[in-house]
């Protein structure tokens, strides 16, 4: 499995210098501390914006990154998206849900590659497609048609 640590740079450097036994620590190329408590100040403004939006019943089930649960209510999907920015992504639970639902293919949107790589290792029975640019759209369409 993979665990992502977030914190101030000095604390993360210390973790890198003294990793837990058997662990490998490396810095991730990210634009921000998304899905961590460092994003908490953004939750309320996003919640206020979300309150101005209308939701509708979803036409397909959504698997929540919070806990891998299937969500079918549009308002709940929006609430979970707002809260997700300051909470960990549980991709492991999402993959378990996809396996239990019989999902056969997943398209990862840009920037793509990380989740498909994890999928390949943890749920090899599910085929992954990393959509990296507009040039990949025809192949992504063919991929989707094979998995409908």
Regions found by a protein language model. Give the residues of each.
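Acyl-group transfer acyltransferase/transacylase scaffold of fatty acid/polyketide systems
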Residues: 1-148
